[in-house]
Curated annotation (Swiss-Prot):
Keyword Cytoplasm: no
Quaternary structure and partners: Monomer. Component of the ribosomal small subunit (SSU) processome.
Record protein name field: KRR1 small subunit processome component homolog
Function in brief: Required for 40S ribosome biogenesis. Involved in nucleolar processing of pre-18S ribosomal RNA and ribosome assembly. Binds to RNA. Required for female germline development, cell viability during eye development and for survival of dividing cells and epithelial cells during early wing disk development.
CDD domains listed in its UniProt record: KH-I_KRR1_rpt1, KH-I_KRR1_rpt2
Biased composition (Basic residues): 232-245
Residue numbers spanned by region Disordered: 232-260, 273-329
Any Pfam family matching the protein: KH_KRR1_1st
Organism: Drosophila erecta (Fruit fly)
Length: 345
């Protein structure tokens, strides 16, 4: 083993500041000289519209997988793709990478992008968004919001996360470094939960600029990130008159008083017929007097004289006018000037 190999295999016990910046050690053929014990295989189905494209690029797929000692099969009758290991396969994880590659190709990812997943530092994530929104109209609108006008939003997500992102049907396929995949998943899920992607894009741009400043490495970045308020425009209309709920009581409401109960309480029940009639007449005359009084007040409103200003207030006004100073010199000069104009004319 050479010195460079010994340096790579040396395990560091120092504390790690940034786990994302750690280099993944390469797995070589010398690390597994005996190969695989048993054969492993994975199969996936693809839609009918991908049949023509897969048939054209399948020789390239076989050539790419043969470099890693894997076998690939395309079954056009069943509409499936199969990858399996061989006796020469020495990397135990390459079959998982090959499975991800055929899954991406089934989700309309081109072969030139899908083959990148075979690299050690590249991963993939297929995000299912079909069940996140109940109504189809809302789902289509939010999915289009993720793409943006002329694909501008999707392109900005790709540039900020260093990932290839493809929106197809009910899934979003992402391919790139693992940190970028985490960011893409957060943006997609929040977009389907009615959070516009521009907010997360702006936050990513600010974080990228903050990472350049070493002084802010150990500080909280929340004060720099924008805070957006949730505005729910479609609120339910509230009634004009709200009914206030009465306090709950386990007992039934009391029985309302009848006419006889009211007469017993007032003592009217024990009066004879003549006394009852006299009481009714008295109440009637009192009501008539009150009505006549209100009517007289309404009629006499037109004959009430308006309030005049007091003599003291008028005298104050006159004193104020007389006390105003007059500039005699200015008035005299004005008269002389007017006389000169009259003579000259």
């Amino acid at each position: 083993m050479s010195e460079s190999d010994a340096e790579e295999t040396k395990i560091s016990t120092d504390p790690v500041d940034n786990a994302w910046a750690m280099k993944i050690p390469t797995f070589r053929e010398e690390d597994n000289p005996h190969g695989m014990v048993e054969e492993s295989s994975f199969a996936t189905l693809f839609p009918k519209y991908r049949e023509r494209y897969l048939k054209e690029v399948w020789p390239l797929v076989e050539q790419c997988l043969a470099e890693h000692h894997l076998k690939a099969e395309l079954d056009l009758m069943e509409g499936s793709m199969v990858v399996r290991t061989s006796r020469k396969t020495w990397d135990p994880y390459i079959i998982i990478k090959a499975r991800d590659m055929i899954k991406l190709m089934a989700r309309s990812v081109p072969f030139e992008q899908a083959k990148r997943v075979l690299q050690d530092d590249i991963g993939c994530d297929i995000i299912k968004i079909g069940n996140l929104v109940h109504k189809k109209e809302k789902f289509v609108k939010r999915r289009q919001r993720l793409i943006g006008p002329n694909g501008a939003t999707l392109k900005s997500i790709e540039l900020l996360t260093d990932c290839y992102v493809l929106v197809q049907g009910n899934t979003v396929s992402a391919l790139g470094p693992y940190k970028g995949l985490q960011q893409v998943r957060d943006i997609v899920l929040e977009t389907m939960n009615n959070v516009h992607p521009i907010y997360n894009i702006k936050a990513l741009m600010i974080k990228r600029e903050l990472m350049k400043d070493p002084r802010l490495a150990n500080e909280d970045w929340s004060r720099f990130l924008p805070k957006f308020k949730n505005k729910n425009i479609s609120k339910r209309k509230q009634p004009k008159v709200k009914k206030q709920k009465k306090e709950y009581t386990p007992f039934p409401p009391s029985q309302p008083e009848s006419k006889v109960d009211k007469q017993l309480a007032s003592g009217e029940y024990f009066l004879n017929q003549e006394q009852k009639q006299a009481k009714r007449n008295q109440e009637r005359t009192e009501k008539q007097k009150e009505a006549a009084k209100r009517q007289d007040e309404r009629r006499n409103k037109d004959f009430v004289p308006p309030t005049e200003e007091s003599a003291s207030s008028s005298l104050k006004k006159e004193d104020g006018f007389s006390s105003s100073k007059v500039d005699v010199k200015a008035l005299k000069a004005k008269l002389i000037k007017a006389n000169k104009k009259a003579r000259s004319s």
